[in-house]
Amino acid sequence: METFLFTSESVNEGHPDKLCDQISDAVLDACLAQDPDSKVACETCTKTNMVMVFGEITTKADVDYEQIVRKTCREIGFISDDVGLDADHCKVLVNIEQQSPDIAQGVHGHFTKRPEEIGAGDQGHMFGYATDETLELMPKCHVLATKLGAKLTEVRKNGTCPWLRPHGKTQVTVEYRNDNGAMVPERVHTVLISTQHDETVPNDEIAPDLKEHVIKPVIPEKYLDENTIFHLNPSGRFVIGGPHGDAGLTGRKIIIDTYGGWGAHGGGAFSGKDPTKVDRSGAYIVRQAAKSIVANGLARRCIVQVSYAIGVPEPLSLFVDTYGTGSIPDKEILEIIKEHFDFRPGMISINLDLKRGGNGRSQKTAAYGHFGRDDPDFTWETVKPLKWEKAQA
């Protein structure tokens, strides 16, 4: 039996880039909660003792940017210099301007256009992907790496492993078999965890704790064997972390946010962007399309691409590939997608309820992935029932 190895990585919420994603999305949530028509393009960067929020925002909302920055940092666990950042004493810089009037007139006509007339906020191409190898219809190695990162945070916050600090990274290599285009995970080949830790914890305590409290609850026993390789804090020391150890920037973890290297990526980041930005809304609708194709039994594996021009509502192109796993030809699946999904940005916002802020909705997406999550706020994960003419037996 021929197999191959494929690897996906993840980082948890204390990684500096992910801290920035969460701040940008917390700002978006605050704007949308008060003004669902807010136009937000919010970037964040951070380094030792400093967080800066900058970008273009047009909103009727009254937003305290500094308060949002400090609250987000505090919730993640950055509460003192020795963990990488002190939420209450770090410098917070804000440089926010209004959306360019040139963009505003082209995209939403300064708020005069009907939803179906709203153009894409920029050009670009986005991909959605789904695979039947997990219940989430997501790649196995990506799901496991993401869940390990989430578990690291959980056992830090609940006190199970009090020596843990916020910044952590995970990586999982899975041995796969190709079943006529569908991916079948056979076993976990390698598990890698690098996590920031307290200065006082001995190295010989870190590995057993990570195996017992992080790896065992996440990776099913059937995927682990005597040949599985574990690299647990292989650098030997990871005390300096967070923004003190590395600079952070919004939008630098786009593969972690999506499919862990599977499928494809158009390059656009998600966090800090309102639904007129098709980098985000376009990627959400093609995920729903790909997931619905697989969940309805039309294919075992599927990728969908959509592309846009700035100011134009209708997509320029749609593409589907089922990697040879389709139960009907791909050209017929493409017609089914066109029939069941509306790819115009204004209609995506309505159909996926993307203008709704509050409940930390966008901020939830900014750590541990935008896809494969079981949460009613992740409306794009809802499978659409698809109707098509089945071939007569």
UniProtKB/Swiss-Prot annotation:
Keyword Metal-binding among UniProt keywords: yes
PANTHER family the record matches: S-ADENOSYLMETHIONINE SYNTHETASE (PTHR11964)
Primary location group: cytoplasm
UniProt pathway annotation: Amino-acid biosynthesis; S-adenosyl-L-methionine biosynthesis; S-adenosyl-L-methionine from L-methionine: step 1/1
Entry-linked Pfam families: S-AdoMet_synt_C (PF02773), S-AdoMet_synt_M (PF02772), S-AdoMet_synt_N (PF00438)
Catalyzed reaction equations: L-methionine + ATP + H2O = S-adenosyl-L-methionine + phosphate + diphosphate
Enzyme class: transferase
Entry protein name: S-adenosylmethionine synthase
Keyword field: ATP-binding, Cobalt, Cytoplasm, Magnesium, Metal-binding, Nucleotide-binding, One-carbon metabolism, Potassium, Transferase
Function per UniProt: Catalyzes the formation of S-adenosylmethionine from methionine and ATP. The reaction comprises two steps that are both catalyzed by the same enzyme: formation of S-adenosylmethionine (AdoMet) and triphosphate, and subsequent hydrolysis of the triphosphate.
